[in-house]
Amino acid sequence: MNSKTLIRVILVLIVIAIGFFLIRRKIAPKKMEKEAVFLGVEGYGDLTKGEKLDHSLISKFKFNFYIDGEQKTLSINNGKEVKEGVYTFELQNQLQEGYVYDIVIDNDTVESVKLLDNDSKTMISGKVNDIEQDKFVQVGEEKIELTKNTGICKITWKAGNSSVEKVGIDDLKDKTVKVTLDKDGKAKNIYLTFISEKYISPVIPIPGEKTLKNFLTTALQPVGTTLYIYGGSWDWQDEGSSLQATTIGIPQSWIDFYQYQNADYTYREKDGNEETKNPSSSYYPYGEWNQYCYAGADCSGYVGWVIYNTLNKESGKDGYVMGATKMAKTFAENGWGTWTQDVKIPTNRDESDFKVGDIFSMNGHVWISFGTCDDGSIVIAHSTPSDSINGQPGGGIQISAIGPSEDCEAYQLAKMYMEKYYPDWCKRYKVVLKKPEDYIKFKKDSAAGKFSWNLENGILTDPDDYTNKKPAEILKDIFQEK
């Protein structure tokens, strides 16, 4: 082969290579950034508990989004594999049904997500005060110009998958909306959707202040505004703490979900009737993974959140959510205090085994003690299922009592403070009274038992002398009553 022929061959090969590259580039999908409403898991409820449940199947889930006016089903990057079939699931842990995100899609797989609710440059939320067809929508005091491409739709939250439907501009009158903005500050999309009212807790804890008083104040912060979700504040994959459990302050998603619901909310089946169970439309995690981990807190999720907020000033560090049964013993093993199974039902305050700030792990439940009253009853805080006034099993974070009857001092204190400071909650739920024989018990051959803080050489101190105060004195002080 002479040199001219060789050059021709090389040139032909170069042209073929360039052509192949251009064709491949044209065919191969590009990364796309899209605005999307997260709707939920495709086939939610299909994977349920059982002897043959393969938990690793959650890594193969597909997810529904509302994008560009239609529902689309996509995969989501699972993150790093930490053990066979179990990944870090960073993106799944960030997604909340019915919320609006900017997402990046690569080859039909979501690679990143960003919640838009917290970005005032890209979203304006509030009540529609004025509208004019094809011209503007006024949200609060903000007048936002419409374009011919402005989308208008309605988001509906519901267990099993949220939904989105197109609506007209007249449907927006006097309703709450989220308006996303284009690069010129004009309305890109208008979502008619639920927006919670601003909530201010009646108690004021100090994140990271390691005192017994602040621990108990922190425990009261989410009372009356957080619903019970089984697996709530565990992470999505049911391995440890959710993002909410390591959030400083009450997570906004807890507040949103509580205000969205009413006395008909049930964390499981309607009327508590298991014969009517339908995993595809229930908030209960029948598949041992927690789609609604962001919406509320179960007992251990709540205590984990309280511990985190007492010991930390910033969000996002390692959390403390674990099985309720082993919480008390684990905290003792951390060097924070002592653990014992040597407890009995108290008959008076002086001889009670239950002190201020104790954490009691039952088999399958955990609660925080605010101390023993003179009559031996105990004021507690916990997240627990309780029936609503409509007979629906809901409940959540609340002040309750352990005692023989509603005449006991602890119940009277719980009732007084719940009704005074959490009236909206009390429109849905009655104050809970638990019998001592039901709430002060455990299996001897388990990790269950009572944890007490070492206030001399442990992680918490007691400069306010809460150890020697009665529950009535403690509640009065925390709520800053004269």
Q: In which residue ranges do the predicted regions lie?
A:
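N-terminal capping segments
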Residues: 198-312, 445-482
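Glycine-rich catalytic cores of cysteine/serine-nucleophile enzymes that process amide/ester linkages
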Residues: 224-252, 284-288, 361-424
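...with weaker cross-activation on analogous glycine-rich loops/strands in unrelated enzymes
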Residues: 313-395
